[in-house]
Design a protein with these regions (language model features):
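Glycine/proline-enriched, intrinsically flexible loops and inter-domain linkers
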Residues: 1-743
Length: 743
């Protein structure tokens, strides 16, 4: 290989590598010498925000991460939660925002590939994917291109690897015009006593590279993901990785076969920072060192330097440590699966990673300095000035409407509320036959083979709420995920998060981050949900324009009996419809307010955590006692949209409903406001007394408001008709709107 270590390191070169001159000076002081060019590249990626979490670690320590079910919390490739019967759920959510904006198809595809590897690296077979996507305004010049590229990338990679994409969310807002968000979640199952960790243990044990060959794609991907965009962002296209889902499928099967052996010591995928990160992190977790010989690495391109080889983020690559003497067994297994593989190093008893190229030393660095040496930056925080302007709603902007049909139709046609079938029909959501029900209900539900159990999955964040109040906005994200799980018949058992924010060097952005993490931590503690894994994505801004704070959360819930699985749509004519929870006069951050006066203002809806918990517990108990037929949470678009969706989302036969509501707040607030902790349920009239008695016994606000039947949605408020619309027309609007924007 060519060697680039003769390059003289100047202040400009240091800054181009994303390090400050102070950080570079500290590296020299701790090393006792100036790093060479290849070593500079290693510090560049390992001390980047993407890998080191240097701006966020201080705050992340405040999240609850332990619990009786937690088998592995943050710090490994994914979190692991016990679900009983010797089985554990392995899950995580990750971002691939910057690459997906530059090259949407490959950026999104490799985001899927990376999160799959995080799961099967732990020894689990991936069984479900979800995604949380954010795009700019629907009429923005790049939105259609970006949406189509991202959806195609996700669907192609997931479909080819045979892992179903079972749910997710997609939102549009001008704040994402310059930075889209692509957050991907994956769930796997594993025997609870067969968890594999990313540790390079056992002095003298061989280190084996396997998977695809190494090329120049993705070099400095981690550093690129740790800086903001500007007008030259298109020039960063070469830093986007290129994925091969068929190679990933081979990798999955090879790894799961490998892990049946008792001589696998530790294993990790090569994700951000590639071979560099996997080598240093595996040594760091084990308290060992590694000697690595780069000439043994399978290469796709000739003439690559050690710098390029170490920083390449070519996809579908893994590093495994096996027991000494088992090298040939491992290599034979990889050959069977047609994967490139080679012994590239061994574990040492030094605290160093030493890297050679044809025997010539090119890197000699202390593991601890590289892995943990980046200082925790408790950056300054400042409450944003914009909040003084936006935290007020002038109710005089919109007079109380006399009729609600046109408003409801506008809401159902909004790309943020419209049915997402155009997206999920491109995904194979039934492969492996574990998915219970079609996408589109409150949570996806996946059966656990070999038992009666199932897992419910939900991902959520309302970034407008977080823009207006990041503390309560993050709490609402947690609460809605938990509510979605309850509506589907599950108990929440674990959470993973993806914290998407702007430039942390801006004190106002750090204030948003601090508030969001604090709010999330308080909500998780209250609901007794451990945060077992996650990801932080900073610098999501272009030319100084930051995205709204978007702390996305995904919650996994457990159904002890999959017969508890409940969906959102009305089932039978004559069933009664009831509302659980309280409605207040709240418009802040709502889709209604945005559509009617094109403003994002006010404060998020009030969230009473105790009421939220009571509402969830009542809903879950009614489901488990088989008292109710449907359950649907009220979120974007409020009660009116929840009612409409309950009427029209039935996959075969939409049903009408007639409602009569007594209200002490404005009509539009009751129907289109987004008061929290409300669930719409339907049930047979024969269960009315039992349902009412349970609500009264648990002291939860509850009211029967109508009945299922007919071919129209009819809503009377205080004795006056407010909405009358045929459900067939509502379904046509709701079902076809998204495709008109992005199809």
């Amino acid at each position: 290989m060519k060697n680039s270590n003769s390059i003289t390191i100047t202040p400009d070169i240091v800054r181009q590598h994303g390090l400050t001159l102070e950080e570079f000076g500290r590296i020299g002081d701790l090393l006792g010498r100036e790093p060479n060019f290849t070593e500079l590249g290693i510090f560049s990626v390992m001390w980047s925000e993407h890998c080191s979490y240097k701006s966020s670690r201080y705050y992340l320590k405040k999240l609850p991460t332990t619990g009786p079910r937690v088998l592995q919390g943050p710090g490994e490739n994914a979190g692991v939660v016990d679900i009983g019967d010797g089985v554990a759920a392995v899950f995580k959510i990750e971002s691939h925002n910057h690459p997906s904006f530059i090259e949407p198809r490959q950026g999104a595809a490799t985001g899927v590939g990376g999160i799959l590897r995080d799961i099967f690296t732990m020894g689990a077979r991936p069984i479900a994917l979800m995604n949380s996507l954010r795009f700019g305004a629907p009429d923005h010049s790049r939105t259609r291109f970006l949406v189509n590229g991202v959806v195609d990338g996700i669907s192609n990679y997931g479909n080819c690897t045979g892992v179903p994409t079972v749910g997710g969310e997609i939102y549009f807002d001008p704040c994402y015009n310059g930075n889209i968000l692509v957050n991907v979640f994956c769930l796997g199952l594993i025997p609870s006593d067969k968890i594999f960790l990313g540790k390079a243990s056992g002095v003298g044990n061989p280190v084996i590279y396997f998977g695809s060959k190494t090329g120049r794609d993705g070099i400095h991907g981690a550093s690129m993901a740790s800086s903001e965009f500007d007008e030259s962002s298109e020039e960063k296209r070469p830093t986007v990785q290129v994925g091969d889902p068929f190679a990933e499928k081979l990798l999955i099967e090879a790894c799961l076969e490998l892990m049946k052996e008792d001589w696998v010591v530790g294993i990790q995928d090569m994700g951000a920072a590639g071979l560099t990160c996997s080598t240093f992190e595996m040594a760091g977790r084990a308290g060992t060192g590694i000697d690595l010989e780069l000439s043994k690495v399978p290469m796709r391109e000739a003439g690559m330097t050690p710098y390029e080889t170490l920083l390449s983020e070519s996809q579908e690559r893994m590093l495994v440590v096996v027991s000494k003497g088992m090298e040939q067994n491992a290599l034979a297994l990889f050959d069977k699966w047609d994967l490139d593989a080679a012994v590239v190093g061994e574990v040492t008893d030094t605290p160093m990673v030493r890297i050679f190229d044809n025997g010539n030393p090119v890197v000699n660095l202390p593991v601890e300095l590289v892995v943990d040496g980046a200082l925790d930056l408790k950056r300054p925080t400042k409450k944003p000035e914009y909040l003084k302007e936006v935290n007020h709603v002038d109710l005089g902007l919109i007079s109380e409407p006399a009729r609600g049909e046109e408003i409801l139709k506008k809401l159902l046609s909004s790309p943020n509320i419209a049915n997402k079938h155009w997206v999920y029909e491109q995904f194979d959501h039934m492969v492996r036959l574990n998915t219970l029900g079609l996408p589109g209900s409150d949570a996806a539900v996946i059966r656990v083979k070999g038992s009666q159990k199932a897992l419910a999955l939900s991902v959520d964040c309302n970034s407008r709420y977080c823009y207006l109040d990041p503390f309560h906005g993050a709490q609402i994200a947690v609460a809605e995920c938990v509510r979605n799980i309850a509506c589907s018949g599950g108990d929440p058992i674990g959470l993973t998060n993806c914290l998407n924010f702007g430039n942390p060097e801006n004190p106002e952005i750090m204030w948003q981050f601090e508030q969001a993490v604090s709010g999330m931590g308080e909500a998780c503690t209250f609901f007794d949900i451990p945060v077992v894994s996650g990801n932080v994505s900073l610098y999501n801004e272009t030319s100084g324009e930051a995205i709204y704070p978007t702390p996305t959360v995904a919650v996994v819930g457990l159904l002890e009996d999959r017969s508890f699985h409940t969906t959102q749509w009305f089932k039978e004519d004559g069933d009664l419809v009831a509302l659980i929870g309280l409605t207040m006069e709240e418009f802040g951050g709502s889709e209604y307010w945005k559509i009617m006066c094109d403003r994002v203002e006010g404060k998020p809806p009030h969230l009473d955590l105790r009421l939220a918990q009571s509402v969830n517990k009542l809903c879950l108990e009614l489901i488990q006692k088989k008292f109710i037929a449907s359950a649907h949470d009220c979120s974007e678009g409020g009660l009116a949209v929840a009612l409409a969706e309950s009427c029209i989302s039935h996959p075969i036969a939409p049903k009408g409903a007639t409602l009569s509501i007594d209200s002490t707040v404005r009509n539009d607030a009751f129907l289109f406001g987004e008061s929290q902790s409300r669930i719409l349920i339907s049930f047979s009239a024969k269960n009315k007394l039992a349902v009412e008695a349970k609500a009264k016994a648990m002291d939860v606000p509850f009211a029967v408001i109508g009945k299922v039947g007919g071919d129209s949605l009819v809503v009377d408020i205080n004795g006056k008709e407010f909405i009358r619309e045929e459900v067939s027309h509502l379904k046509e609007l709701w079902f076809g709107a998204l495709e008109t924007y992005v199809g």
